[in-house]
Amino acid sequence: MTVTAAMVKELREKTGAGMMDCKKALAETNGDMEAAIDWLRAKGIAKADKKSGRTAAEGLIGIASSGTKAVVVEINSETDFVARNDAFQELVRGVANVALGTDGSVAAVSKATYPATGKSVEDTIKDAIATIGENMTLRRSALLEVEDGVVATYVHNAAGEGIGKLGVLVALKSTGDKEALNAIGRQVAMHVAATNPLAVRSSEIDPAVAERERNVFIEQSRASGKPDNIIEKMVDGRMRKFFEEVALLSQAFVMNPDQTVEAAIKEAEKSVGAPIEVAGIARLLLGEGVEKEESDFAAEVAAAAKG
């Protein structure tokens, strides 16, 4: 397969690797972008695929909650100017509230009736496009619900009540005190916003993702020239660390790095007065997974921290 300049540029943007390294990686992997990323990582040239950290679209994340049930939605716009528009912000809040009465899927939310217009959410968004003069789309939504307990919420970079650039839901099952439960739930939600875990528990991580990491670690370890039995132990150790870093419960708690999230939740059971189980998490970052070259979420966060 012919390696084009556009392919090299895309790989450079995703990995930060040099142009010649990117060209070689693509040649070695027959133009397979994901395989080329792994090839660069195995050679120690790139740490990881950066694409998940790049902001790709404007708009807002909206959250609505009823205590034991909460939903997070993403509505994209073309410009940040529209995202600051009062009418657009009200639309995002309204769609989130409508979504709370559905199963949380984009299809169900789109077909649901928007009370203020009497039309479907889909048609209401179309009307807003005509009024505001910019394309908009309901891109993603997620819903969590528990029978006993709470679904805690957190909005980062809030533009107003329940709307912002990043939204998190954390479902906690417990028969204990709701106020205390919501307090630890909000802390865990803030932690999820900061660390973006792949799953609640290591056993829930996609086997394909784990296998991909193992293969990269194997290639990296082989470069040491050590015997296979030593390499196997090295890889096993790195996989244990990988699971600890990407599974929520085993991560160091952002609020207190001296304990894990699991330990923090266990400690909170004293004030809650009952056992707590993390039943699920949902995290939506605006524009995640759809790249936009001129905007880098990591750079925005760094700039905000300095300002």
From Swiss-Prot:
GO cellular component: cytoplasm
Keywords attached to this entry: Cytoplasm, Elongation factor, Protein biosynthesis
Pfam family, one: EF_TS
InterPro entries: EF-Ts_dimer_sf, Transl_elong_EFTs/EF1B, Transl_elong_EFTs/EF1B_dimer, Transl_elong_Ts_CS, UBA-like_sf
Gene Ontology molecular function, alphabetical: translation elongation factor activity
Subcellular location, principal: cytoplasm
Keyword match Protein biosynthesis: yes
Top-level lineage group: Bacteria
Region described as Involved in Mg(2+) ion dislocation from EF-Tu: spans on this chain: 79-82
Presence of keyword Cytoplasm: yes
Localisation: Cytoplasm
Function: Associates with the EF-Tu.GDP complex and induces the exchange of GDP to GTP. It remains bound to the aminoacyl-tRNA.EF-Tu.GTP complex up to the GTP hydrolysis stage on the ribosome.
Protein family membership: Belongs to the EF-Ts family.
Official protein name in the record: Elongation factor Ts
Source species of the chain: Rhizobium meliloti (strain 1021) (Ensifer meliloti)
